[in-house]
């Protein structure tokens, strides 16, 4: 990997000027969310962090200057919907929400049990939807939502039917929501993150990953596919 988060993000004067000011990062204990939170903080954004691992979350919040933080469970959809109102209260207002939550799952469709399929749909689709649903009423014109889906939406491989279905459901939902919110001046960015080097596939909820090509650099990918679109004007980034 390259240097620290700020170095890889390529922080410039323009970036600092266009970075959202008050940001909720959901999934801040994961690799993508953690990198995004650190880069946004270095650009001067006031960030609130939400994540599954309470201990890691507290550590990351402390390293960013004792930022507001809240642990959540993706299966608690009401709790997911409540993250944005909590962040708005903690930060004073909310300009942007970054959602980087998910879990991988592998195996032919007939080998994936119903419980695993439900888990994949809940964590990869329903939980992010709930977060966004709770955030939309709080965002004013110029507000932005960035949600990580993945390139699997564009080319779902064999052996990942349930995982791909969940991510595709989320991407479809984001596309419609983006059109609905456009008149309000709120952008919804569908982040088609590439496969990254970071061990995500190895932590699958079911099955084992196939042989995968080398992943992209995480810091550079977060900058290109997530942070740059949030500061710019695109609604989908591949």
Regions found by a protein language model. Give the residues of each.
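Substrate-binding pocket helix/loop in short-chain dehydrogenase/reductase
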Residues: 108-109, 113-119
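Rossmann-fold cofactor-recognition segment
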Residues: 63-78
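Conserved glycine-rich cofactor-binding loop
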Residues: 29-30
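Conserved NAD(P)H cofactor-binding loop of Rossmann-fold oxidoreductase domains
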Residues: 100-106
């Amino acid at each position: 990997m390259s240097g620290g988060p700020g170095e890889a993000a390529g922080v410039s004067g323009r970036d600092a000027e266009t970075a959202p000011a008050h940001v909720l990062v959901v999934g801040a204990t994961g690799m993508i969310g953690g990198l995004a939170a650190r880069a946004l903080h270095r650009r001067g954004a006031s960030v609130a962090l939400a994540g599954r691992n309470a201990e890691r979350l507290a550590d990351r919040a402390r390293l960013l200057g004792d930022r507001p933080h809240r642990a959540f469970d993706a299966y608690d959809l009401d709790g997911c919907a409540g993250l944005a109102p909590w962040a708005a209260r903690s930060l004073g207002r909310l300009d942007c929400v970054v959602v980087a939550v998910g879990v991988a799952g592998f195996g032919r469709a007939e080998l994936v049990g119903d419980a695993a399929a439900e888990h994949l749909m809940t964590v990869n689709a329903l939980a992010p939807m709930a977060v966004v649903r709770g955030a939309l009423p709080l965002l004013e014109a110029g507000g932005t939502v960035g949600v990580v889906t993945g390139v699997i939406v564009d080319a779902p491989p064999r052996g990942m039917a349930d995982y791909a279905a969940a991510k595709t459901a989320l991407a479809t939902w984001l596309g419609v929501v983006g059109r609905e919110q456009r008149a309000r001046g709120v952008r919804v960015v569908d982040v088609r993150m590439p496969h990254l080097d970071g061990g995500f596939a190895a932590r699958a909820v079911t099955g084992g990953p196939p042989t995968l090509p080398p992943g992209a650099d995480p810091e550079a990918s977060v900058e290109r596919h997530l942070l740059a679109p949030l500061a710019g004007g695109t609604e989908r980034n591949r």
